[in-house]
Amino acid sequence: MKKIAVDAMGGDYAPQAIVEGVNQALSDFSDIEVQLYGDEAKIKQYLTATERVSIIHTDEKIDSDDEPTRAIRNKKNASMVLAAKAVKDGEADAVLSAGNTGALLAAGFFIVGRIKNIDRPGLMSTLPTVDGKGFDMLDLGANAENTAQHLHQYAVLGSFYAKNVRGIAQPRVGLLNNGTESSKGDPLRKETYELLAADESLNFIGNVEARDLMNGVADVVVADGFTGNAVLKSIEGTAMGIMGLLKTAITGGGLRAKLGALLLKDSLSGLKKQLNYSDVGGAVLFGVKAPVVKTHGSSDAKAVYSTIRQIRTMLETDVVAQTAREFSGE
C-alpha cells in the first residue's frame, strides 16, 4: 500500500479542491492510502471516501505570505510540517502540498532530508510541448544560484526521472543557453557543457534555446534555478496570454468570430488542454529522500488527482530509492 501524506490546507481552493481530488484518486487507485492533515471539520465537509483515508487534525497552517524557513521552524503543528514529518518518520511514503512553495522546499530540505551526495535538490516539472509529450525541466527555482556540478547533477536526476517515471528509454538532455553552439554562454554554462558532454551515461544533445522548448527539442532541460523559474513563469504567462487573446478576439469579433469559434470548438479545447497544468501533475523536489511534490497553488480537484497519480507512479517505479542508490554508489 502506497501511503501519501497530503497537506489539506495548502492552496487557493483548500480544502475543497484538495479533498475532492483525493476522493477521486481513492476511487480510481486501490493501492493508495491517504493521510489528510488539516482542520478536521472543514475536511469532512468534502470527504466522501470512507476507506484507506485518515484525517490528522491540526488548526495550524502555513500561509502564502509566511517566510518559508521561519514558518517551518515556528509552526511545528502546521499541516504541511506534520505531513513532511510523517514521511521522515516512515508513516508515509510521499508528501503533497499546494501551499507555500518556499515552505515546502524548506520542509523537503530540513525535514525529509537530502539524498547522500546530492548537493542541491532541484525543483522539476513536466512542461507542455506542441506534440503533447512534454519535457522535464529543472531547476525551476529551488536554488537561486548554482554551480556547474549542481547542473550536472540535475541532468542525471532529470534523465533518471524521464527513464523511470515517463518511460523514455534514452532521454535527450539539453542545456538551456543563449545559443546552440558549444561556445555559447557564460562561464557557468560553458563549464556545465563540458561536464555534460563528458558524461557518457547521458544522452546529451548540447545547448538548447528557450524558443525551442515547447517544440520538444529535448526530453530533459537543465537550467540554474533563477533562469528556470523565469522560463517557467514565461511559459505560464504566455499560455494564459494566448488563451486571453483568443477569448477577446472571439467575444469582440461579432457573429462571424463566434460562429468560427463554434466550428473550432474541439480544436480550441485541445489547445487549452495542451496548455493546462491540470493533467500534468506537480513539481517534484528531486534529490530528497522521498517524493516531495508541489501542485500549483490554484490547483483544482483534477490537478490534485493528477498529482496523486504522478506520486503513485513515482512510488511504483521506486525512482527515489533508485536515485539514492545511484548517487550513494551502493
Swiss-Prot record:
Q: In which pathway does it act?
A: Lipid metabolism; phospholipid metabolism
Annotated GO MF terms: phosphate:acyl-[acyl carrier protein] acyltransferase activity
Which is one Gene Ontology cellular component term of this protein? cytoplasm
Give the main EC class: transferase
Top-level division of the source organism's lineage: Bacteria
Compartments it resides in: Cytoplasm
**Pfam families recorded:** FA_synthesis
Question: What InterPro entries is this protein classified in?
Answer: FA_synthesis, Phospholipid_synth_PlsX-like
Q: What is its EC number?
A: 2.3.1.274
> Reaction catalysed?
a fatty acyl-[ACP] + phosphate = an acyl phosphate + holo-[ACP]
Q: Which Gene3D superfamilies match?
A: Isopropylmalate Dehydrogenase
UniProt entry keywords in alphabetical sequence: Cytoplasm, Lipid biosynthesis, Lipid metabolism, Phospholipid biosynthesis, Phospholipid metabolism, Transferase
Instruction: Kindly give the SUPFAM superfamilies that the UniProt entry links to this protein.
Output: Isocitrate/Isopropylmalate dehydrogenase-like
GO:BP terms for this protein?
A: fatty acid biosynthetic process; phospholipid biosynthetic process
Q: What does this protein do?
A: Catalyzes the reversible formation of acyl-phosphate (acyl-PO(4)) from acyl-[acyl-carrier-protein] (acyl-ACP). This enzyme utilizes acyl-ACP as fatty acyl donor, but not acyl-CoA.
Q: How does it assemble?
A: Homodimer. Probably interacts with PlsY.
As for family, the record states:
Belongs to the PlsX family.
Q: Which PANTHER family match?
A: FATTY ACID/PHOSPHOLIPID SYNTHESIS PROTEIN PLSX, PHOSPHATE ACYLTRANSFERASE
Q: What is this protein called?
A: Phosphate acyltransferase
Q: Which organism is it from?
A: Streptococcus pneumoniae serotype 4 (strain ATCC BAA-334 / TIGR4)
Gene behind this chain? plsX
